[in-house]
Regions:
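Class I SAM-dependent methyltransferase Rossmann-like catalytic core
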Residues: 2-27
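A conserved beta-strand element that flanks and buttresses the S-adenosyl-L-methionine
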Residues: 119
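Conserved catalytic/acceptor-binding region of the Class I
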Residues: 148-221, 225, 229-230
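Conserved alpha-helix/loop element of class I SAM-dependent methyltransferases that forms part
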Residues: 22-41, 57
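Conserved Class I S-adenosyl-L-methionine
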Residues: 202-279
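A short glycine-rich, Lys/Arg-flanked "PGG" loop and its adjoining helix->strand segment in the class I
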Residues: 131-146
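A short His-aromatic
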Residues: 125-127
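Class I SAM-dependent methyltransferase SAM/SAH-binding core
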Residues: 45, 51-102
């Protein structure tokens, strides 16, 4: 029963991404709809676009748009190019100082003077210099353009009941893992945007609880099996690290109990997603 959670095949990863799209669309689809519909044919920059699936989901119902997606992971860009015919996809890193000069020639080719929407979904937590990156992005905004920042803050994350403290331990494991990014990024977004020169900063959404979903198992499917795969791979990559071995074995031994918790009527799980817009 446990072994089926110890790896994610390509098909399972595709399924996880579909779940992620469904969950996050439920979380803040209205924010994106309002931003996209401010202009008849919005020019959109999707920062950290990955395979492009999330943005394509958000753009459903938008008749006309111009899209450029950027990601520093070349493999993801190759997938986006093969999967989506609408839009341009580039291997670029927004944290590089020359990012604006690198993307402007492509903007000119696409007839884009400035972006009406710049989307940063789950990327600021991984930035070394968020203010610098956001400042560069601001120079690419069109007049009256909007930046959308969706990120996470584990201070908003909780699970209850948690008598065995399994979820408490899991949250601590995530917070102590530098490769997971800044797990308290969400509370800093307003300050980052202010220092980067943005105005009219608004916080639209705070926290996504399982009680707001028709099927709260979606939150389990979104996060938990993928994390187990991550901890397994980290252990396999560094087998001599006893702490990482211990983390993986604990996760492996407790994942079924965590799933059982999600299936209980009185259980609630909250993920710390946040959504800001600024101009």
């Amino acid at each position: 029963m446990i072994s089926k959670y110890t790896t994610l095949t390509g098909a399972e990863e595709d399924q996880r991404l579909d779940v992620q799209n469904s969950v996050l669309c439920h979380f803040d689809r209205d924010v994106y709809d309002n931003v996209f519909r401010k202009k008849e044919c919005p020019a959109i920059l999707d920062v950290g676009c990955g395979t492009g699936n999330m943005m394509q989901k958000m753009l459903e119902g938008i008749a006309s748009y111009k899209l450029i997606g950027v990601d520093k992971v070349e493999r993801q860009i190759h997938i986006a190019e093969k999967t989506h015919t609408s839009g341009r996809f580039l291997t670029l890193d927004v944290e590089q100082a020359d990012f604006p000069s690198m993307i402007r020639p492509v903007m000119e080719e696409e007839g884009i003077d400035g972006f009406d929407v710049i989307n940063c979904s789950m990327v600021v937590l991984h930035m070394q210099n968020p203010v610098g990156a956001l400042s560069r992005l601001r120079t690419l905004l069109a007049p009256n353009g909007t930046v959308v920042v969706r990120d996470i803050d584990d201070g908003l994350q909780y699970a209850w009941p948690d008598q065995e403290r399994r979820f408490e331990k899991l949250f601590m494991m995530l917070e102590n893992d530098e490769r997971m990014g800044d797990r308290h990024c969400g509370r800093k977004i307003y300050s980052y945007l202010t220092k980067a020169g943005f105005q009219n900063i608004q916080l639209h959404k705070v926290g996504l609880a399982s009680t707001s979903l028709k099927d709260k198992m979606l939150l389990f499917d979104l996060a938990i099996p993928t994390l187990l795969h991550y901890y397994e791979q980290r252990h396999l990559d560094t087998p001599n690290n006893m702490q990482w071995k211990e983390d993986f074995e604990w996760f492996r031994d407790n994942i079924v109990a965590m799933k059982d918790s999600f299936g209980k009527e009185d259980f609630v799980f909250s993920a710390g997603f946040m959504n800001f817009t600024a101009e």
